[in-house]
């Protein structure tokens, strides 16, 4: 639609607004009591014959947005849409009277109306409502996008999500499914004895992950604060305090790039369980995700893009070093210097930064050469100690940690470990991170004295888990971009 056409439409719609007022009707309506939603009408009455509907004279009241409209004269049809779908209405001047029929005639696509009437089927067998009362509820002053040309622009769908929800039933379905996924997640955890808690979103120290924070300032306290990059360290304090199984589903903020997999604010599930380790958390993770898929989708076998993914437990478990050996043919089990690791990286075309040591290079091999090949659910465990400052070292090979990440369709979906509960070791790890920061790693962890003090009171052996909720929703709704599963994703200025 050209700018000129839009301006014409806006003018015409404002003129119609005046006409509605001249008829003594409030163009922005009032409360309307519905008996049914569109989908319920099909469920209840869709199988009845024309004759049965005629005989039963079923009275209903529905409300929604006009999506199609045809026929004028003394009778017309329209489809109105509510959250569940569309139902056809049939409006006849003889049934509703002159004033209400005039209202119907001047109604535009996008206007919101309420109707009362009886159920019937048209000649072609379409379930419809024969309207006896037509009530105007909201005048739309802007036209909806044209059905077949209007909302193909993906950027407009993200910027004006309300139009996307009106015009694209698939989009609405995705967001309803998202809500069901989070409800199912909560139900599972609540029924397994986990306590849902809420912890601060503004932190004095940015910790719990390798990421750049958003920085803000508290005027009254005159102090710098960081929007949380993880929920982890506050939940661990609660484990110290004796709350043995805790979780939080909440927003996390990372001041980083935007991509099909990354948005600066996103939703995480973080969970901690005292007296558990990372292997217990593996079992919990596969059972939780399989439960959600079964409850929400009715199956653990799902389509994602070109892949058929089987979420049925038990999932594959593979050490990071073995994964590199399997997919690249390089063996990092043998002892080697940082320099030898660097040479291997050069040989295999793996890019490494100046501050990187043996463990970082192992991780780079995995991320650059293996990660995107892991289509079926796979737990990759045994991450190097250098990239896991909050995880317990593996007792058999202290170069690695008791940590895992879950990969499905080549993407990380969860991160978990046997938590580091030794405050002396934790302090040393933080000190190593500070050295990395000095060498140019701006994602290295800061020193957190308050957290160290909490650990010194004694935290029991603990297993912890973080699941990216948005990525899980992408997987379970077959959505290619994170922006397809966020109602209002972050966008650049127009």
From Swiss-Prot:
Record-linked Pfam families: tRNA-synt_2, tRNA_anti-codon
Main location: cytoplasm
GO BP, sorted A to Z: lysyl-tRNA aminoacylation
Cofactor(s), names only, from the UniProt record: Mg(2+)
Reaction catalysed by this enzyme: tRNA(Lys) + L-lysine + ATP = L-lysyl-tRNA(Lys) + AMP + diphosphate
CDD domains in UniProt: LysRS_core, LysRS_N
Binding residues annotated for Mg(2+) 2, in chain numbering: 412
InterPro entries: Aa-tRNA-synt_II, aa-tRNA-synth_II, aa-tRNA-synth_II/BPL/LPL, Lys-tRNA-ligase_II, Lys-tRNA-ligase_II_bac/euk, Lys-tRNA-ligase_II_N, Lys-tRNA-synth_II_C, NA-bd_OB-fold
Record's subcellular location: Cytoplasm
NCBIfam families cross-referenced by the UniProt entry: lysS_bact, PRK00484.1
Entry's family note: Belongs to the class-II aminoacyl-tRNA synthetase family.
Quaternary structure, from the entry: Homodimer.
Name of this chain's protein: Lysine--tRNA ligase
The organism's taxonomic lineage, starting at the top: Bacteria, Bacillati, Bacillota, Bacilli, Bacillales
């Amino acid at each position: 639609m050209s700018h000129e056409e839009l301006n014409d439409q806006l003018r015409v719609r404002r003129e119609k607004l005046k006409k509605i007022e001249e008829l003594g009707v409030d163009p922005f309506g009032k409360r309307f009591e519905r008996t049914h939603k569109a989908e319920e009408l099909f469920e209840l009455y869709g199988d009845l014959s024309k004759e049965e509907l005629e005989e039963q004279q079923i009275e209903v009241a529905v409300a929604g947005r006009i999506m199609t409209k045809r026929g004028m004269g003394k009778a017309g049809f329209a489809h109105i849409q509510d959250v569940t779908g569309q139902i056809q209405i049939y409006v006849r001047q003889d049934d509703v009277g002159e004033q209400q029929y005039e209202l119907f005639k001047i109604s535009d696509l996008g206007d919101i109306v309420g109707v009362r009437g009886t159920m019937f089927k048209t000649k072609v067998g379409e379930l419809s409502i024969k309207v006896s009362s037509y009530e105007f509820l909201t005048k739309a002053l802007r036209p909806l996008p044209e059905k077949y040309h209007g909302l193909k622009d993906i950027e407009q769908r993200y910027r004006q999500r309300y139009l996307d929800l009106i015009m694209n039933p698939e989009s609405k379905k995705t967001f309803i499914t998202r809500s069901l996924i989070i409800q199912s997640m909560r139900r599972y955890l609540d029924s397994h004895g986990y306590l849902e808690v809420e912890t601060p979103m503004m932190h004095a120290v940015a910790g719990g992950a390798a990421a750049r924070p958003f920085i803000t300032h508290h005027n009254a306290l005159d102090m710098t604060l960081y929007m949380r990059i993880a929920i982890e360290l506050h939940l661990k304090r609660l484990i110290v305090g004796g709350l043995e199984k805790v979780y939080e589903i909440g927003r996390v903020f990372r001041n980083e790039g935007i991509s099909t997999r990354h948005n600066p604010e996103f939703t995480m599930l973080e969970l901690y369980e005292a007296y558990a380790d990372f292997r217990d958390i593996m079992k919990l993770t596969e059972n939780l995700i399989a439960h959600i898929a079964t409850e929400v989708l009715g199956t653990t076998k799902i389509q994602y893009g070109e892949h058929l993914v089987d979420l049925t437990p038990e999932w594959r478990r593979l050490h990071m070093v073995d994964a590199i050996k399997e997919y690249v043919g390089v063996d990092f089990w043998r002892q080697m210097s940082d320099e030898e690791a660097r040479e291997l990286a050069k040989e295999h075309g793996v890019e490494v930064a100046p501050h990187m040591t043996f463990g970082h290079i192992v991780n780079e091999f995995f991320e650059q050469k293996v990660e995107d090949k892991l289509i079926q659910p796979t737990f990759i465990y045994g991450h190097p100690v250098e990239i896991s400052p909050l995880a317990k070292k593996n007792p058999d090979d202290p170069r690695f940690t008791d940590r895992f990440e879950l990969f499905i369709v080549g993407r990380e979906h969860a991160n978990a470990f046997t938590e580091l509960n030794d405050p002396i070791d934790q302090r040393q790890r933080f000190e190593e991170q500070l050295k990395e920061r000095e060498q140019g790693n701006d994602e290295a962890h800061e020193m957190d004295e308050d957290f160290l003090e909490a650990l010194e009171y004694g935290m029991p052996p603990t297993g912890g888990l973080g699941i990216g909720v948005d990525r899980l929703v992408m997987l379970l709704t077959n959505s290619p971009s994170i922006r397809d599963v966020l109602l209002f994703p972050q966008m650049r200025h127009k």
